């Protein structure tokens, strides 16, 4: 990963952008705790609504992220499972009801968003950049059920979208 260039954005220097072969309109970032409004043990850029942080601070932090990435981040309630959510277009739905550990979208203006601490963020994009996905891969999700983990699940959904004509180009 490389640090984001200040000329590219006003993101904190501690945020990292992967160096991966995707079209220029596909962006990914790994945030740090720098740049937000939360205080105390959640300071400063806490994006998680599942902790005892002040809800208004979490919403303000999510607004900081949305402004920085220029897209609507969709957050899931991650449960260390294998379910994959297909995200709607920006503004079509809230994110509080989405229970999944991976998401995929063909919608412009939507940011597939996963939160990780000791788990892995896995990002996918096809070569045209018309299908993108993100997975929260912890050991339970990687192990899965009956031989199918979160990575197999997200890849199946991702591949189906690309194959069905919603996206063009080969899968990376």
Where are these regions (language model features)?
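Active-site microenvironment for binding and transforming phosphate-containing groups
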Residues: 1-172
